[in-house]
């Protein structure tokens, strides 16, 4: 990967070992994905918003970075955190949480604690390059907003937030944003979460193009969140609705789809029947993305 003279100086340790380690992480990631260079980002979103013992390496790096006086160089938001003030078990499992949050805030991170950062605090524009690490936010940014981000991992996300840079590969490139699976909808009563769950299973890490449907913002959020959870989908298109799918040829980037699927009402109903809440269920936990008043 080709670095600028400034980036090379950081890598060589001019600004201290902590910043050099951050640059080394991005260079290794870029080399792994054959990225030709590092490019500036508009914002970052972190997943490391909670402290448990298994993420020891991440916390040690975070402490070193704070001790060195480094701060994030772009607007940076955070995923949800545990409700340690309410649950006794959380006060044990996440006993270092308050100190962890103090470190993050010392870095200049916005303490929003939400995976729907794109609704407030961290709202990108079409074409913005991001370094986000929450899968449900990543798919929404790519698909609904038309911003560009890969799905980043813990530790790499904080390095990108500090340097304000990301390796140029994957969904940052035009050639990787085209649809690969054409999805026809034969549905009378739309169930966006069920549809997303099915498509995640069927598409895995491929990008689907759906027939036109007037999804609401909440439905698009839940559609994408379910795809990212049941599969590895990072982007989807809805014909005539999402910004990079004004027509079929544009969404497919002029290529024939690898596969064509038809999702029917029976498919959605069967999924609900198989995965529905049973009568003797004592508790239901709802995860990301968070619900709204709508």
At which residue positions do the language-model features occur?
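Non-transmembrane, aqueous-exposed alpha-helical and coiled segments at domain scale
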Residues: 1-294
